[in-house]
UniProtKB/Swiss-Prot annotation:
One GO BP annotation of this record: ribosomal small subunit assembly
Cofactor(s) needed for function: Zn(2+)
HAMAP family found in the cross-reference section: Ribosomal_eS27
Region annotation Disordered: where it falls in the sequence: 1-23
Cofactor binding notes: Binds 1 zinc ion per subunit.
Protein name: Small ribosomal subunit protein eS27-like
Coiled-coil regions, chain positions: none
Species of provenance: Bos taurus (Bovine)
Ranges of Basic and acidic residues composition bias in the record: 1-16
This protein's record includes keyword Coiled coil: no
Residue spans, zinc finger C4-type: 38-60
Molecular function in Gene Ontology: RNA binding; structural constituent of ribosome; zinc ion binding
GO cellular component: cytosolic small ribosomal subunit
Length: 84
């Protein structure tokens, strides 16, 4: 680790590792995402830190399950982060 670090222009990797309140510009860790069901290929919008089990609207398959932080996607589900 170098002794001289540029505090005004930190690298993107350093900023991602910091706590959300300690970043140069505060930003949340959570986001919304489009999750595609592996069975019926319908797209459902899911919160990244969902606290309840999310089911598919079409076939009632479990898309994600809550953990302590981020929700765990079911195997076979693909997702895309939504742009704001």
């Amino acid at each position: 680790m170098p002794l001289a670090r540029d505090l005004l222009h930190p690298s993107l990797d350093e900023e991602k590792k910091k706590h959300k309140k300690k970043r140069l510009v505060q930003s949340p860790n959570s986001y919304f995402m489009d999750v595609k069901c592996p069975g019926c290929y319908k797209i459902t919008t899911v919160f990244s830190h969902a606290q309840t089990v999310v089911l598919c609207v079409g076939c009632s398959t479990v898309l994600c399950q809550p953990t302590g932080g981020k929700a765990r996607l079911t195997e076979g589900c693909s997702f895309r982060r939504k742009q704001h």
